[in-house]
Amino acid sequence: MHLYKTSTPSTRNGAVDSQVKSNPRNNLIYGQHRCGKGRNARGIITAGHRGGGHKRLYRKIDFRRNEKNIYGRIVTIEYDPNRNAYICLIHYGDGEKRYILHPRGAIIGDTIVSGTEVPIKMGNALPLTDMPLGTAIHNIEITLGKGGQLARAAGAVAKLIAKEGKSATLKLPSGEVRLISKNCSATVGQVGNVGANQKSLGRAGSKCWLGKRPVVRGVVMNPVDHPHGGGEGRAPIGRKKPTTPWGYPALGRRSRKRNKYSDSLILRRRSK
């Protein structure tokens, strides 16, 4: 991490990653057309504060880890503009080259492997049934063979707390406790770049490069734009409770859909 000198207001307290480079392999990237910018098919804003941003090349990440029982070596640790975690380029013994999420503490030259009954070592991928209780894991499958879908953000880590019957009980980074099939795979260890959420960008322009627009309070808008808007001067919102721009209750109302198939698999809801 490189901290800028406090020479100008725009760079004061800013920080950038100086050690991690971005020089991806051509056969592991492809262009993507980012359309919508938070709009739906009618052109109406459905997700706020999105738009602009620098062009990106998508890196193909191996979330399935289906190179079974073939050892690979970490060749580079690279920056990925599509996620806040770093990625590693792996050279496998059979000549295959793939990107994976960078496990915390992994360095260039380390070896990894995936499969059944492989060592419980940082970066190795194996089924939950072969892991001891208390193992810290990330990149967890929900559906067998579909690839990791849980605990993939920077610093994310889940914990295997029980195994019974055909299911394993996991405590996820959100605090949720849920059941997953013991045959699903996961990667040992924690995702790297733990301090990603504590990094100071230093200026508004750096936020714009990430494709994030300014956040504006509803109370300073016009009535046509937000239910909180309008009034003379600094006026209250004029309602009993805060609402979203579309008039639905905000700040506390549960937004999860009812009667989902996974309701029976969640033993304890996530903590807020």
UniProtKB/Swiss-Prot annotation:
Residues 1-13 have a biased composition (Polar residues). One of its GO terms (molecular function) is rRNA binding. It holds the Pfam family Ribosomal_L2_C. Residues 1-27, 222-272 are annotated as: Disordered. GO terms for biological process: mitochondrial translation. Its main location: plastid. GO terms for cellular component: chloroplast; mitochondrial large ribosomal subunit. The keyword Amino-acid biosynthesis does not apply. The keyword Chloroplast applies. It is found in: Plastid, Chloroplast. Keywords: Chloroplast, Plastid, Ribonucleoprotein, Ribosomal protein. Belongs to the universal ribosomal protein uL2 family. PANTHER family: LARGE RIBOSOMAL SUBUNIT PROTEIN UL2M, RIBOSOMAL PROTEIN L2. Part of the 50S ribosomal subunit. This is Large ribosomal subunit protein uL2cz/uL2cy. It comes from Buxus microphylla.
